[in-house]
A protein has these predicted regions:
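Domain-level signature for proteins that mediate thiol-based redox and metal-cofactor handling
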Residues: 1-93
Length: 93
């Protein structure tokens, strides 16, 4: 599994001084699962991935079925936050 971080997401992660990040399923919708990104220690069964000086813990159920995750940051009029794109599809958090 590969993790990609866009320039906007990397800048925001630097801005908030984020480390030890965990990616997990936060719920399910019509188009599939929603993923969350939060600071936290790895949990039992997580896959740990180092990328650009950061440590990411990814839930095993995600790592087993996803080829790559792209972490992006969106800032708009009504909302802002990290967006996780999986295999070319998106999920917001």
């Amino acid at each position: 599994m590969e993790i990609r971080i866009t320039e906007k997401a990397a800048a925001e992660l630097d801005n908030i001084n984020a480390d030890n990040l965990r990616i997990a399923v936060q719920g399910y919708g019509w188009s599939g699962p929603y993923f969350g990104l939060a600071q936290g220690e790895p949990q039992y069964g997580d896959v740990t991935i180092e990328k650009d000086g950061r440590t990411f813990a990814v839930e095993r159920e995600i790592a087993d079925v996803v080829n790559y995750l792209e972490i992006d940051y969106y800032k708009g009029w009504l909302r802002k936050g990290f967006q996780i794109n999986i295999n070319g599809r998106s999920s917001s958090c």
